[in-house]
Amino acid sequence: MTNGSFRQIINQLDMRWRRRVPVIHQTETAECGLACLAMICGHFGKNIDLISLRRKFNLSARGANLAGINGIAEQLGMVTRALSLELDELGALKMPCILHWDFSHFVVLVSVKRNRYVLHDPARGRRYLGREEMSRYFTGIALEVWPGSEFLAETQQIRISLRSLINSIYGIKRTLAKIFCLSVVIEAINLVMPVGTQLVMDHAIPAGDRGLLTLISAGLMFFILLRAAVSMLRAWSSLVMSTLINIQWQSGLFNHLLRLPLAFFERRKLGDIQSRFGSLDTLRATFTTCVVGAIMDSIMVVGVFVMMLLYGGYLTWIVLGFTMVYVLIRLVTYGYYRQISEETLVRGARASSYFMESLYGIATVKIQGMAGIRGTHWLNLKIDAINSGIKLTKMDLLFGGINTFVAACDQVAILWLGASLVIDNQMTIGMFVAFGSFRGQFSDRVASLTSFLLQLRIMSLHNERIADIALHEKEEKKPEIEIVADMSPVSLETTDLSYRYDSQSAQVFSGLNLSVAPGESVAITGASGAGKTTLMKVLCGLFEPDSGKVLVNGTDIRQLGINNYHRMIACVMQDDRLFSGSIRENICGFAEETDDEWMTECARASHIHDVIMKMPMGYETLIGELGEGLSGGQKQRIFIARALYRKPGILFMDEATSSLDTESERFVNAAIKKMNITRVIIAHRETTLRTVDRIISI
């Protein structure tokens, strides 16, 4: 037997008393199947995160069916068995196993005891259900999964190290060093203060020496003033550090987010992305408020422990014993605390996504009479998030109560034992009072340090959420080349172009060969759902093809660079958006320097200039992010004007005139045709199709 095979067998052995099934929440809207497999793999010792699974098995926003999950499980070295069964037969399954849930979801069945079912839901976390609710959602399909001969228990997790995050901040090391030095001064003063109290009680008071009392008091006052001044300086330095971290982390992550491929956003909910971005604030707050304090707590724990040994002898070990009770309680309950923390974040993000979705579709909500339903559903989601937060608060209150109780017991025990030592003349009153002060500092510092260390572990949760954005591969950016934006027509060609949404789905199109000459206008037609918009996004460089090439003027757009290619083209898509600002800013792309004459010409070509001029503020008219106050046709004409303002060599239009009346559509098509630029159009209207040189059906 080789060392490698022996190591594999050792990894597969589980010598623990109990195998846990981890709770893993899905990130994308349709990756519940991947999350279920990640949980089962974790149960059998293969700790693999969703980022790793996603990179290996690229699923689309449409998700995967049971056959797809079965195929992925086999590639992970698992053995599977699909079953159709009744609810009463669930207890006979090999658990954990995967259940088909509510005809559109997958969950992991962890255990069945009497009529109590424990599930790990990728969308909601750990759930305890009764028979009635199980009967309502279980579809009768289950998938048993267990390790096969090729299964390897290992760790495959992609994460961001805290060190790399810290090292990426300019000026952080100098600021940290300053804060550390100031903290040393403050903590040294804290150690001196009890000694001053002891000197007063053991020397100044028994001797009746007012001069010594005055000298000690003056010295203590000096140290108090010094501590206040240094504390203010440290607070200012902490503010500087917090600002440095906040700006650099958030700007870096936001810039990275904007450069991610379109598919990343299509598979996620906006509220979840916003929640993950907000995890930066938690990391920043934890780092700026706790890291330096934790370092000083560590130093002080050692220093105070030594002082306690010098002053109290064996009393120190009693204090240590009481303190360890609290530490052990926190360590034992950490797993549950982390699980609730993650559920709170996920449920809050889900409620936020639903809230934003309702606002974006407010017109539909009103027209369809869905206000009551949407309001009730949002309230239920919010209550779920609040309940998770309440659980977290309860645990914090419980820990606070336990800490107070343990500290009180410790204080009473030390009071009795210490007073006995004083009565027996084995300790002076001053030493006893000083020891009590050191005891309080030791207990508080250990409790604070324990909370920080556990908080540091909780930070890994936020780290994982940020990693989903930060470690996602962004679009490749090539060095910018000089491109003259003068509407010179360019050629467009595809060779053996193929695309499918993911490895589990059929190809949308394959072996596609197109050729569009410079200045030619081509219309792409086909039945709804045939893949016209998907093809348009591939041609625009928004989606990357599985195989084949897209060539512009004979150059592969990947070789040219998507960033350079986008400077040569303009697109008007079905789901285009206006941004909060003026009409001028939207047409000119919020550029600092604008060409008003060309802007007006583009607006005239789009048949929107006269409409804009009738508005009280003309081109300075403000519009909201949803384009309030504008009709669908007016928005589309502004979209077209915005595209023309870029002076593109190719203009892509996906149903760009579908909301226009016949006269406006005829005018816009004629005006664009006169510009003699290359056009690729998706359209169904005969009036638009008559303006093109060639029609391609797919």
From Swiss-Prot:
The chain crosses the membrane at residues 33-53, 90-110, 289-311, 315-337, 397-417. Signal peptide: none annotated. Coiled coil: none annotated. GO terms for cellular component: plasma membrane. GO terms for biological process: bacteriocin transport; protein transport; proteolysis. ATP binds at residues 526-533. It is a multi-pass membrane protein. One of its GO terms (molecular function) is ATP hydrolysis activity. Keywords: ATP-binding, Bacteriocin transport, Cell membrane, Hydrolase, Membrane, Nucleotide-binding, Protease, Protein transport, Thiol protease, Translocase, Transmembrane, Transmembrane helix, Transport. It is found in: Cell membrane. The keyword rRNA-binding does not apply. Its main location: membrane. InterPro entries: AAA+_ATPase, ABC1_TM_dom, ABC1_TM_sf, ABC_transporter-like_ATP-bd, ABC_transporter-like_CS, CvaB_peptidase, P-loop_NTPase, Peptidase_C39. SUPFAM superfamilies: ABC transporter transmembrane region, P-loop containing nucleoside triphosphate hydrolases. It comes from the Bacteria. Its EC number is 3.4.22.-, 7.-.-.-. SMART domains: AAA. Belongs to the ABC transporter superfamily. PANTHER family: ATP-BINDING CASSETTE SUB-FAMILY B, COLICIN V SECRETION-PROCESSING ATP-BINDING PROTEIN. This is Probable microcin-H47 secretion/processing ATP-binding protein MchF. The gene is mchF.
